[in-house]
Amino acid sequence: MIAAFIKRHAPQRRLSLWLALPVVALLALVMMPALFRHDSALQIRASRQGASLPDGFYVYQTLSAQGIHIKSITPEQNSLVIRFDSQEQSYAAERVLRELLAQDFDIAHHHNQSATGWINRISFKPQSIG
């Protein structure tokens, strides 16, 4: 009786396996860019209490005048985060901003963990990708 049931439903299981396999492969393909994206960014913070952040438009104009393309500038947790298309542009912008802003501000590379953060939230052990 059990053998007859298994034999009768075997083609349906094979079909569902062949349907599930492309769905999983497509899902993995769609998730790859999000998992391995390296967002190049700088974060500017005031080095002393009471100092205000530089104007984002002023920073944009200064970096654009130097030929540095900026993807976005956003305020984020008492800092200014500037995103770039490439690591080279980020390093060039860091040099320009260190001269421009002198010692009033801390300039550091900003590592965005949002792409892999969801993996760390569902896992017992933190993951490091890349």
From Swiss-Prot:
The way this protein sits in the membrane is described as: Single-pass membrane protein
Function of the protein: Modulates the activity of the EnvZ/OmpR two-component regulatory system, probably by directly modulating EnvZ enzymatic activity and increasing stability of phosphorylated OmpR.
Belongs to which family?
Belongs to the MzrA family.
- Which segments sit on the Cytoplasmic face? 1-15
Recorded hits in HAMAP family, A to Z, give: Modulator_MzrA
This protein's UniProt keywords: Cell inner membrane, Cell membrane, Membrane, Transmembrane, Transmembrane helix
Transmembrane segments annotated in the record for this chain: 16-36
- Residue ranges in the Periplasmic topological domain are 37-130
What top-level branch of life does the organism fall under?
A: Bacteria
User: Which InterPro entries does UniProt cross-reference here?
Assistant: Modulator_MzrA, SecD-TM
The protein in question is named Modulator protein MzrA
Where does this one sit in the cell? Cell inner membrane
Oligomer and partners: Interacts with EnvZ.
Q: Name one GO molecular function term.
A: protein kinase binding
